[in-house]
Amino acid sequence: EVKNAFEVYEHLLEMNPYSRKDMLKAHKMLMHDLTKEAGAFRQGGVGVFAGKRLVHMAPPAERVPQLVKELMDWVKKDPAHPLIKSSVFHYEFEFIHPFADGNGRMGRMWQTLLLYQWKPIFGWLPIETLIRERQEEYYRVLGEADHKADSRVFIEFLLQAIYDTLVEVESTEQVRVQVSEQVQRLLDALENDTLTTK
């Protein structure tokens, strides 16, 4: 799995975040030799479990291609701030759960790709690592958002993780010299921007 992840990351920033073909290609690389459904949308029902308790039942498999297309169209065209759009995309992607396996990592990677399209610095920030370090909270807020049918708590969690990553990178001496101006502008935007579409 680690070898596969490295291969995806080698090619991720060359991919089009609005292309289902590229998404399927990334999934095929990520899940190569791990599942028979690598590189294909799931064919059956799938649920997300916390232990033995079902916390989310994903939409029917036959709806997945259209739901993913609609989500990609929305994220491409909506005028919302890219930080908000990428976070909403991540939530909706996990809600759709388009693959039999690998949805969490794909959602995090695709959010990174969307953010990279906005500001290339995001291609080099360890946001996914920070989210993985907070995996228990990640799944808790994802479940809470799903239960309430309100994605705000999940979006707030992701925005905080992005902010924390930027602060961590900005405070690292070696990296500060290379990216401090870009990171500082992003931090300023996060602190000063209301992140609305207006």
Residue ranges and their predicted role:
Residues E1-K198:
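FIC/Doc superfamily catalytic core
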